[in-house]
Swiss-Prot record:
Signal peptide: none annotated. Changing S178A: Reduces phosphorylation on serine residues. Abolishes phosphorylation on serine residues. One of its GO terms (biological process) is establishment of centrosome localization. Changing S178D: Abolishes interaction with MAD1L1 and reduces interaction with CDC20. Residues 14-197 form the HORMA domain. Changing S195D: Binds to the N and C-terminus of MAD1L1. Abolishes interaction with MAD1L1 and reduces interaction with CDC20. Component of the spindle-assembly checkpoint that prevents the onset of anaphase until all chromosomes are properly aligned at the metaphase plate. In the closed conformation (C-MAD2) forms a heterotetrameric complex with MAD1L1 at unattached kinetochores during prometaphase, the complex recruits open conformation molecules of MAD2L1 (O-MAD2) and then promotes the conversion of O-MAD2 to C-MAD2. This is Mitotic spindle assembly checkpoint protein MAD2A. Coiled coil: none annotated. The keyword Acetylation applies. PANTHER family: MITOTIC SPINDLE ASSEMBLY CHECKPOINT PROTEIN MAD2, MITOTIC SPINDLE ASSEMBLY CHECKPOINT PROTEIN MAD2A. InterPro entries: HORMA_dom, HORMA_dom_sf, Mad2-like. Keywords: Acetylation, Cell cycle, Cell division, Centromere, Chromosome, Cytoplasm, Cytoskeleton, Kinetochore, Mitosis, Nucleus, Phosphoprotein.
Length: 205
């Protein structure tokens, strides 16, 4: 019985993949809300990580994000994803205005039958809460997006990975004349996520 309990408390490869994929689901929703990419009335409040977070009620967006998160979970489990990037662009000109980059490190020695890593869910959630709080706080320094914007998700994977048909190849979509701000990181001991946001420096007329 004691052995079973310790397995439940530890972090397994599959459990780690689920934790990180879930973070991206809430993190992307937070970015889309904070940056006004979708109307605020299309979001609803939920409790997660000891915070009140906003998630979309837009059915098309829910479907899209669910598909992305499920695919991401699989790639995280296989340790074959290197980074996820949320790109925010001016709808009219296509110019990239913000680039939220999450670098993902994976301990490839972790296997299904490996002993669970000793880190509590609470410790991981505390770290994730700090990252989400920082995403929320970025509105205090990021330039106001005064034009209509859209977003793209870029996922960098190992070169030999088979990618689903609906996914398209993309360039890195970097920003010209940008500032970068590093955000906090979190780790499950199997996956580590480092966060940063780059934004276009406003030009004074």
């Amino acid at each position: 019985m004691a052995l079973q309990l310790s397995r439940e408390q530890g972090i397994t490869l599959r459990g780690s993949a689920e934790i990180v994929a879930e973070f991206f689901s809430f993190g992307i929703n937070s970015i889309l809300y904070q940056r006004g990419i979708y109307p605020s009335e299309t979001f609803t409040r939920v409790q997660k990580y000891g915070l009140t977070l906003l998630v979309t009620t837009d059915l098309e967006l829910i479907k899209y994000l669910n598909n992305v998160v499920e695919q991401l979970k699989d790639w995280l489990y296989k340790c074959s994803v290197q980074k996820l990037v949320v790109v925010i662009s001016n709808i009219e000109s296509g110019e990239v205005l913000e680039r939220w980059q999450f670098d993902i490190e994976c301990d490839k020695t972790a296997k299904d039958d490996s002993a669970p890593r000793e880190k509590s869910q609470k410790a991981i959630q505390d770290e994730i809460r700090s990252v989400i709080r920082q995403i929320t706080a970025t509105v205090t320094f990021l330039p106001l997006l005064e034009v209509s914007c859209s977003f793209d998700l870029l996922i960098y994977t190992d070169k030999d990975l088979v990618v689903p048909e609906k996914w398209e190849e993309s360039g890195p979509q970097f920003i010209t004349n940008s500032e970068e701000v590093r955000l906090r990181s979190f780790t499950t001991t199997i996956h580590k996520v480092n966060s940063m946001v780059a934004y276009k420096i406003p030009v004074n007329d």
